[in-house]
Amino acid sequence: MNARRKKRLALATALIGGVAAIASLLLYALNSNLNLFYTPTEIVQGKKDTGVKPEVGQRIRVGGMVTVGSMVRDPNSLHVEFAVHDAAGGEVIVTYDDLLPDLFREGQGIVAQGVLIEGGKLEATEVLAKHDENYMPPEVAEAMGQSHEKLDYNAEQKSGY
């Protein structure tokens, strides 16, 4: 092999290696920023079609209804813990260390985004509450399916305390 062919081979090898490195870094970056949506039942039992459960440490979004009577606040900090359930009966505990949205109440639909820290526990970095009584996030509405009924709030729930 002459010198010219060796240079071409080295250049082609470096080019292919560089493209492979860039592609792998790009896929890694996209994968780490991917937030998959799960219902509480899917977190506990796995997806219906595939049986795939989210892994501990994975960034996910979970949507459902805040279980009435499940909210526990730490009086000395912003830390709050509450349960989110769906129509199929699955329940996930969500912990959050920031201010909750003004529209957050027990018995209403929410979407929480964060990291799964245990099989049924999510450490949320963001909590989104529905806008009004008629609105429900599309993922939650689809996950709740036909069994979602309009909720009747008592005076205490409407006041937010």
Curated annotation (Swiss-Prot):
Membrane topology: Single-pass type II membrane protein
Gene3D superfamilies with a match to the protein in the record: Nucleic acid-binding proteins
Keyword Magnesium: no
One GO term of the biological process aspect: cytochrome complex assembly
Cellular localisation: Cell inner membrane
Binding site for heme: 131, 135
Transmembrane segments: 9-29
Side Periplasmic, residues: 30-161
Gene Ontology CC: one annotated term: plasma membrane
GO MF annotation terms: heme binding; metal ion binding
SUPFAM superfamilies attached to this UniProt entry: Heme chaperone CcmE (SSF82093)
Major localization listed first in the record, in broad terms: membrane
InterPro entries given in the database record: CcmE, CcmE-like_sf, NA-bd_OB-fold
Keyword vocabulary terms for this entry: Cell inner membrane, Cell membrane, Cytochrome c-type biogenesis, Heme, Iron, Membrane, Metal-binding, Signal-anchor, Transmembrane, Transmembrane helix
Keyword Cell division carried by entry: no
One Pfam family this sequence matches: CcmE
Cytoplasmic side, ranges: 1-8
Source organism, top-level taxon: Bacteria
Family statement: Belongs to the CcmE/CycJ family.
Function, as annotated: Heme chaperone required for the biogenesis of c-type cytochromes. Transiently binds heme delivered by CcmC and transfers the heme to apo-cytochromes in a process facilitated by CcmF and CcmH.
Protein name: Cytochrome c-type biogenesis protein CcmE
